[in-house]
Amino acid sequence: LLFILSCKDKETAKKKEIEAFSTIPTLFTLLNQEESGFYFMNEVNQSEAFNIMTYEYFYNGGGVGIGDINNDGLPDIFMTGNTFGGRLYLNKGNLEFEQISGSANIFTRGFTTDVSFVDINDDGYQDIYLCKSMAGEIEYRENLLYINNQNNTFTNKAKEYGIADAGFSNQSVFFDNDNDYDNDGDLDLYVMNHRADFDNAHSIYDTK
């Protein structure tokens, strides 16, 4: 009899605890893609020639960049993609987004490993710098600098700015004015690259 009463007390206490939590206001609401217009899936398709054994960073995501590309006070989003570059989403307000990569002239191929929003030419508009990796062809491995044309379109000028790094990059950092590397008043950039050879991964793959 005592054991039964003990179980009942525990059930009552748990019920009260649940009821107490139910009175706490909800802090977050999950929006579906129909409501937000935001849909993104970073699909990574393996093959015999392209997998974790041939490229050790196969499953490494490149992250997310947030910046206001049209100065409307709303944060826009760039989602990086492993095998298709990434997508740019324009914030239209009221938690609604539009995928504008095509109309914005942002066309990327290959692995995108990092994204940075930065006003690199000091014109008051956010530009986008993308780190690239994996691809054997240099043209698909060069980092990209999309200069904001101030009309929701961009132009890649990485080579013009001398930062089309093709050294298997995986992260970039722009120094602010308080950390000016050479104190000349210009924006400096540090790009981190990983090893260009994957001999260890290949040796494991060859033994299977």
Pin down the residues of each PLM region.
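Acidic, glycine/proline-rich Ca2+-coordinating loop motifs
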Residues: 7-208
